[in-house]
From Swiss-Prot:
Localization, UniProt: Nucleus
GO BP field: nucleotide-excision repair; transcription initiation at RNA polymerase II promoter
Protein name as catalogued: General transcription and DNA repair factor IIH subunit TFB2
Subunit structure: Component of the 7-subunit TFIIH core complex composed of XPB/SSL2, XPD/RAD3, SSL1, TFB1, TFB2, TFB4 and TFB5, which is active in NER. The core complex associates with the 3-subunit CTD-kinase module TFIIK composed of CCL1, KIN28 and TFB3 to form the 10-subunit holoenzyme (holo-TFIIH) active in transcription.
Cellular component GO terms, alphabetical: nucleotide-excision repair factor 3 complex; transcription factor TFIIH core complex; transcription factor TFIIH holo complex
Membership in a protein family: Belongs to the TFB2 family.
Length: 504
């Protein structure tokens, strides 16, 4: 899920809550600031234009500010603001006038001007009142450990420490993981693998959206839940904040947010918490690396004043070796794969659908095989997801060669409609064929009966198995039959009775 798609999901959730709840939300300046950041660019422009104007404005006047080729964006901006009840429409003498929601306007003004914010941005604790100051390095290590513990668990990496019970329940509730029948173990689902392909900010919000839905079933106040989430995104990393103004619901949330690595608390002083860099990503447009571990490293090791987009780095095909993204891989037409990574998490993700053979200091080598793809398919990963993962992590050199090849085709035939093929077509086609092969074949657990003395014995047992609904397959010529696991005991008992009767 791209961050634009994620914004749509968050906005959609906010649109679906009752207007009375929305009005309560808008009493928090921090929440208003976060919602403003989620709006389309044109909607932000309109809000900043009218925020200090208490008079009603004609919708036609706003329309005049937009060029003819931007009418679609204009409609989307107005629609998004109306659905969130940020605009209050009125009709005067047949003319449609609009103005900002008064509650939102007052809170957003206070957020911009530093007015009365009612501690919605947290209560900072002076360092003089702290026994020890927690530095950024500790917070970064804590956040990385907590978050990657969740990701490692999802890909099945053997770990000394499991995620908390709350995290496991959320993974199960969000259908990212499912329990293996007759076992206490969990396995990743189709949605879970797609989750691993997302950027870290998208991953965090995907979990928190499920947390919001789970909170509803637990009768937690949605206003307190949302206010706390948006507040975390507005806090300053490295500062200590007091729990003094938090509600009972938010204090409970604080314990859950610790499990996700969004906040840090010292056991010796539970009245103080520290937001981590992961919490900053809740209201940030900054895009992270495509890989899970690479994203963590990028966000946690990035200086506060670093504003360079990582997309610029990835879009540049010419670069130094150290500029190549962690996990960039090369695939040959013989299905051999080379991935430039040394992250245990990245290697664990690859092992879900690649047979890894060798590991070096900064690279792993393996091969995509029928068995490795079948294992991934059985675990709920689709062929399209595997292909999408390989394409998104393709080495820049592979992308450049693919673009050069497509450019030559366009020079010969300007009407060429061929897509950009980053991966070898043989690899893509074969992965899809392996999925079709698995879709055609159904597997059943049961027992095979062979070596019948006579055709009469075979037909008799075959008829009995068919009558009780246990017969799955038979071969009259070779005198073989296959019965289900559930019906095998009955068929076996029947066969023993007939053999005993025959011997008598």
């Amino acid at each position: 899920m791209s961050f634009s798609g994620l914004k749509h999901s968050i906005t959609q959730y906010l649109e679906e809550i009752p207007s009375q709840v929305q009005t309560r939300l808008y009493k928090s300046p921090a929440t208003c600031l976060a919602i403003y950041r989620l709006l389309p660019t044109l909607a932000k422009f309109f809000i900043m234009t009218v925020i200090f104007n208490d008079k009603d404005i004609s919708l036609r006047d706003l329309d005049r500010w937009v060029k003819s080729n931007g009418k679609l964006q204009f409609q989307e901006a107005i629609k998004s603001m109306k659905s969130l009840h940020l605009l209050i429409p009125t009709r005067v003498n047949g003319q449609l006038l609009i103005n900002l929601n008064p509650t939102f306007r007052e809170s957003f003004r206070n957020a911009l001007t530093g007015g009365e914010v009612n501690n919605s941005f947290g209560i900072v604790v002076d360092e003089d009142r702290l026994d020890t100051v927690v530095n950024l390095a500790v917070l970064d290590e804590y956040a990385a450990t907590k978050w990657e513990t969740i990701l490692h668990f999802m890909v099945g990496t053997p770990m000394a420490k499991m995620p908390s019970e709350n995290v496991l329940n959320l993974l199960k509730h969000s259908k990212l993981m499912e329990e293996v029948p007759d076992s206490s173990e969990f396995m990743i689902t189709n949605e879970g693998f797609q989750f691993l392909l997302q950027e870290v900010n998208s991953q965090i919000w995907s979990l928190l959206l499920q947390y919001l839905k789970l909170a509803e079933s637990l009768h937690m106040d949605p206003v307190h839940v949302l206010n706390f989430i948006f507040m975390l995104g507005a806090l300053e990393t490295g500062k200590a904040y007091s729990t003094e103004n938090l509600s009972e619901t938010q204090l409970k949330m604080l314990l859950d947010m610790r499990d996700y690595g969004l906040v840090f608390q010292k056991t010796s002083n539970p009245n103080i918490f520290y937001p981590t860099r992961l919490a900053q990503m809740l209201t940030s447009d900054t895009k992270s690396m495509r890989t899970a571990s690479g994203a963590m490293e990028s966000v946690l090791n990035k200086p506060d004043d670093a504003a360079k987009s990582t997309d610029d780095k990835y879009d540049s095909l010419e670069g130094k070796a150290e500029d190549i993204q962690d996990g960039a891989l090369i695939i040959e037409t013989n299905f051999k794969l080379y991935s430039y990574c040394n992250s245990p998490l990245q290697i664990a993700i690859l092992s879900l659908f690649v047979h890894l053979k060798s590991r070096f200091a900064n690279m792993v080598a393996g091969q995509i095989t029928r068995e490795s793809i079948r294992r991934a398919l059985i675990n709920g990963i689709t062929a399209d997801q595997v292909i999408a993962y390989l394409e998104s992590h393709a080495h820049p050199q592979m992308r450049r060669l693919a673009e050069e090849k497509l450019q030559k085709k366009l020079e010969l035939d300007p009407n060429c409609k061929d897509p950009l093929q980053v991966l070898p077509p043989t690899v893509v086609d074969q992965i899809k064929l392996w999925q079709l092969e698995l879709d055609r074949v159904l597997t059943y657990e049961g027992s095979l009966y062979i070596d019948f003395d006579t055709a009469q014995d075979f037909n008799m047992l075959c008829k009995y198995a068919q009558d009780i609904g246990a017969l799955l397959w038979k071969d009259d010529r070779k005198r073989k039959l296959f019965v289900s696991r559930e019906g095998n005991a009955q068929v076996l008992e029947y066969a023993k009775r007939k053999i005993k009767k025959k011997e008598e």
